[in-house]
UniProtKB/Swiss-Prot annotation:
It comes from Saccharomyces cerevisiae (strain ATCC 204508 / S288c) (Baker's yeast). Keywords: ATP-binding, DNA damage, DNA repair, DNA-binding, Nucleotide-binding, Nucleus, Phosphoprotein. Changing residue 848 to A: Fully functional in a mismatch repair assay. ATP binds at residues 982-989. The modification Phosphothreonine is found at residue 451. Signal peptide: none annotated. Residues 166-190, 198-207 have a biased composition (Acidic residues). NCBIfam families: PRK05399.1. A motif (PIP box) lies at residues 27-34. Changing residue 852 to A: Moderately reduced activity in a mismatch repair assay. The gene is MSH6. This is DNA mismatch repair protein MSH6. Residues 1-11, 54-69, 103-121, 220-233, 245-270 have a biased composition (Polar residues).
Amino acid sequence: MAPATPKTSKTAHFENGSTSSQKKMKQSSLLSFFSKQVPSGTPSKKVQKPTPATLENTATDKITKNPQGGKTGKLFVDVDEDNDLTIAEETVSTVRSDIMHSQEPQSDTMLNSNTTEPKSTTTDEDLSSSQSRRNHKRRVNYAESDDDDSDTTFTAKRKKGKVVDSESDEDEYLPDKNDGDEDDDIADDKEDIKGELAEDSGDDDDLISLAETTSKKKFSYNTSHSSSPFTRNISRDNSKKKSRPNQAPSRSYNPSHSQPSATSKSSKFNKQNEERYQWLVDERDAQRRPKSDPEYDPRTLYIPSSAWNKFTPFEKQYWEIKSKMWDCIVFFKKGKFFELYEKDALLANALFDLKIAGGGRANMQLAGIPEMSFEYWAAQFIQMGYKVAKVDQRESMLAKEMREGSKGIVKRELQCILTSGTLTDGDMLHSDLATFCLAIREEPGNFYNETQLDSSTIVQKLNTKIFGAAFIDTATGELQMLEFEDDSECTKLDTLMSQVRPMEVVMERNNLSTLANKIVKFNSAPNAIFNEVKAGEEFYDCDKTYAEIISSEYFSTEEDWPEVLKSYYDTGKKVGFSAFGGLLYYLKWLKLDKNLISMKNIKEYDFVKSQHSMVLDGITLQNLEIFSNSFDGSDKGTLFKLFNRAITPMGKRMMKKWLMHPLLRKNDIESRLDSVDSLLQDITLREQLEITFSKLPDLERMLARIHSRTIKVKDFEKVITAFETIIELQDSLKNNDLKGDVSKYISSFPEGLVEAVKSWTNAFERQKAINENIIVPQRGFDIEFDKSMDRIQELEDELMEILMTYRKQFKCSNIQYKDSGKEIYTIEIPISATKNVPSNWVQMAANKTYKRYYSDEVRALARSMAEAKEIHKTLEEDLKNRLCQKFDAHYNTIWMPTIQAISNIDCLLAITRTSEYLGAPSCRPTIVDEVDSKTNTQLNGFLKFKSLRHPCFNLGATTAKDFIPNDIELGKEQPRLGLLTGANAAGKSTILRMACIAVIMAQMGCYVPCESAVLTPIDRIMTRLGANDNIMQGKSTFFVELAETKKILDMATNRSLLVVDELGRGGSSSDGFAIAESVLHHVATHIQSLGFFATHYGTLASSFKHHPQVRPLKMSILVDEATRNVTFLYKMLEGQSEGSFGMHVASMCGISKEIIDNAQIAADNLEHTSRLVKERDLAANNLNGEVVSVPGGLQSDFVRIAYGDGLKNTKLGSGEGVLNYDWNIKRNVLKSLFSIIDDLQS
């Protein structure tokens, strides 16, 4: 929802919430004030409405004496808010005349103006009925208002003097007729920034503002009844178009011109707009290419020189920026508002119903929002997939006048560009998980042209690709890069993209191959942004990247480069280094490069880590739904959702890394399991850690903002407090007998942590940082800062002395200073004491109780005070930057190592809570790593789970009744492969996924939801599940099946776990059966992995009934043949299923009986005919008439062993393509083959 802003109301709030007669009387008295008689000869002046700033309440303090006799710095006392204040000018004859001579008929709702009364009065009764006004700060904005505002708004228009009864449900922003005039940009800027000198703009609801001059232009605001987004149902039903889910209520931002007719005004504007911006009709890029051109660059816009010559300074300032980021939504700062022009304004209107201003600005269509709502509206555009550019004022109006006087326009420049993949502001980040922006580059396998390679290797490289990638989480500043060689199917790229799932991708135009491009887009996050940039000029090559790093001076010297950057450049990894260059260009364009690259948080990414962790490739991550489900792409029901119980944001991001790379080494797994056991038993330690971690903010992201100097002061204080909490934890754990990884992580805290944290304990006034969001250093810390503070105190003392003098002079102790908008330190004097006011004092405001003045000396001191505070504000910002720089000096040596340790401990707590949450039964897995004593090679793997449940079903269940458990045993005493058959929907796929999930949990160091678990460490899980085609990647169902199967055959080892579901069903029955039989034999005999093959080919089991490493399994069911009802028991038993029972499932789905009966007859005939043909062929091939079937796999193996390369994994060997084919595996091959022969003979 949009940030709600209190709306300025032209009427008082009444307790009953309705427009009572008292309210009308009050409004009448307000209007009659403007029509009172003025002595003749008084020069007439225009009636000015207050700026937004003058409509706010300013809390003030009473003047008190210092107990030590000195003067206190508090110069203000509270105002009596029962006084009703009204708006006026020094003279009002023009208004009186306009009202009396108006040619337009008056509305029935208009109030009569009493032109004979010299002064307007308001009764106490009126005031008593408007108590809800008290102590409310008033801010005018385009967009929001309170629900309790009156339904009717009365607006006095200039010249005509007509009071308009507004029935609009929108807020409107109405500048003066000259505001935004193309010939008066300077004044336009000045008026937008009025009120900057004071944070609040007045302490009364309706203030008598007597202007000194008539030349200044003011904005008039027309606010009408409109609910705040926080308090109104966004999807309310009205006559307008239906709101979108995130759509804010209708708003308008309408510059007003004092034309006689709104229709003629709008028509005139539209005509001028069309004439001046005719070149926007046929959009072209900066090189004048039309949209139809393949090389069209949507980021730029061509503006003809004739248009440039007609632009005002303000227009030039805007279009200079907008033309270079035509694909961005540009928020342009104007005073206390951000404005959208032309295409951006129209888009805002179409998407979010932000109203288009009727009169525009400088002939540009516009919509506007208050500056305080920028983050909300920027986030709305970003969620819709747009980029947002923020153009801010680099100086205040006062600073501009101090710099060059009244000439010129306020400096503005592009502050930042916000995109969904590169957000750094904590308020705009809605997830604790990392969001990545990735740059990718592709080159052919022979890119490096290595002449020393033999011809066969060169031919192989022609079928490979080289990829370079670099990706960054801009919120933390962590940048990772890599270069890798991939196969023709881009297997590794698929894995990388599945792990990273970037929100934004930068790629060189026409660089990626068709397949790589499809993989990148298919595996990126939903609504990801894809940026195609120019080769060389924007996506830097290796040499250009090096030159940019040197010229931009991210690092002091070349020796100061991060190790991975230095290594890539020195070793000639040009593709990876160029990928970093592509990312560097994009960060420069976003104006993030200085802050992020200089952090030196650059590492090499290893997406496999095969030596230290289990490998989960991209297909497996998708098939097992590790991070996102296949239903809606969220994490509901995923394994990550089960494990994501970390307390700190850093811990949640670390947990994702842990889950991508489960442990592989037995000692590492056991150590983590010991830690989990320790935390499960030591409740006190757990509570201590959890309480401490719950107090920690997102330190990793805050450190990045400290480095970029964008952190808020109060957040900087939070960082120091958080590290103080950490050293308290460290101190309290000194005497604890910590076990496992907890002890390892606690001891990894840097030695200088305590000293570094204590040096910041008293660096500045902490409480002021929390309460006032300012840094006040200890006296003597900064000389310039001390001088500035002394100057402000000196001015306050002088003002205090003058005030005390005035009190004595007027013999009135109630004289005080008041701030009202940009007029600060105005002298407020009770009416009873104003008769002695000197004639040279200038009256600034008045009500029935007080009048406010400026004397010459106070006006001068007030101006000096404003300038002093402006200078002090700059010093405060500079001081914060220097403090951030000092803190950031220990980023890599102290702060980040500490955060890493905390994140790891938090992950241990998360695994502990997951283990506790599994319910009963659950157990600690037993890890067994068997090695051949003679050859020191790993023996074949095995696993055994008793009464295993799927952990993502019925989370937190306390009994096993909620899910039907199953025993799973592969390897060791049982065959390594299970050939699983059964009816459709009987639970085969669930069994397959459940086995894989259990293995991952065990190697994560977590308890497993079963009665007992014993397994060897599994090096890789590979899956072939489902029968979906892949339109995004241009692959058919059968192609997807075979491509995934090839990866299994290439990468699997005797310690891998394979899951293959219904291989071959994408092709014809004969082709599919042949492929399934061949693959199963090769895996069972030569690769010797653990795994399951689920199939509906009933005869496949008979082909392997003699194979010692294939075990037939089935899912049990109960069948009622009469009604064709099937009861699924979800229990896995040994044996072969009687069939797939497809007709029964069809009946359960409601297909008509006639169709099912016909299908059953056809199926019976087909099965009978197929069996007769097979038996006849077998009999014809047997001389003795006996039907003996020799498996095709056995025949092939003997041919290769006898006539090929024998027991080798060469092209003609029996184990062709097998990754690991050592002597133990070869011995098992021979055992299997001879076992099959023995069974055939028997």
